[in-house]
Amino acid sequence: MMLKRFAVAAACILFASSSGAVMVTGDPEAGAATAMPCQSCHGLDGNSPSPEWPKLAGQHATYLKKQLQDYRSGARVNAIMSSMAASLSDEDVANLAAYYSSQTTAEGATPEQYVELGEKMYQQGNKESGVPACMACHGPGAQGNPAASWPRLSGQHAQYIETQLKSYRSGERANDPNEIMRGAVKKMTDEEITAVSHYVSGLHVAE
């Protein structure tokens, strides 16, 4: 089990080092104009008012670009997003990523009942079942890793995070490099997923 945890951590490090050359450039002002149709779901500044839809504000440009490209190519599927991304050019994708990454993420909050288990899963994982610590890839403050395209989770809607973790677990979502997320969550229980989703939503570090 310990070897599995080290394997995931090593995979994160190796992928980060091999992805360091990935650069996302774009025009935030042009992205703001392109983003107008996105506002109905993702909010005026990328802070979605609905927990069903993700906050895009403050998310890493590298991650945003990859997700839009994956929706466009079919590597990630969602009825709404696949349709929205289909007509985006590479320039549109870069501009949208630049715009949303330049916005400020609205902080979340963690209900008290999820703190203990959520913190344990995030910082330590579950040694008995072989679930690795989320912190190994997403960082101590859930800020993610832009060089490796690991997303920022801090401030994200707990409901959205929970949905994505369960989608990885079931295999419905499969656009994670080297199956890292599918491997990490496959032995997580519903209770663990719910707790860690709420925990990271409220986790933040002083800038």
Question: What does each model-identified segment do?
Answer:
Residues 21, 102, 117-124, 135, ...:
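Predominantly soluble domains enriched in secretory-pathway, periplasmic, or organellar proteins
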Residues 49-55, 70-113, 146-152, 169-195, ...:
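Axial heme c-ligation environment in periplasmic c-type cytochrome domains
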Residues 29-36, 61, 123-135, 154-163:
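Sequence context surrounding c-type heme c attachment/ligation sites in exported
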Residues 26-73:
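The feature marks the first
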Residues 18-35, 49-52, 102-128, 207:
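Electrostatic cytochrome c docking/interface patches
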Residues 31, 38-45, 96, 131-140, ...:
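The canonical Cys-X-X-Cys-His
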Residues 2-21:
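Gram-negative bacterial Sec-dependent N-terminal signal peptides
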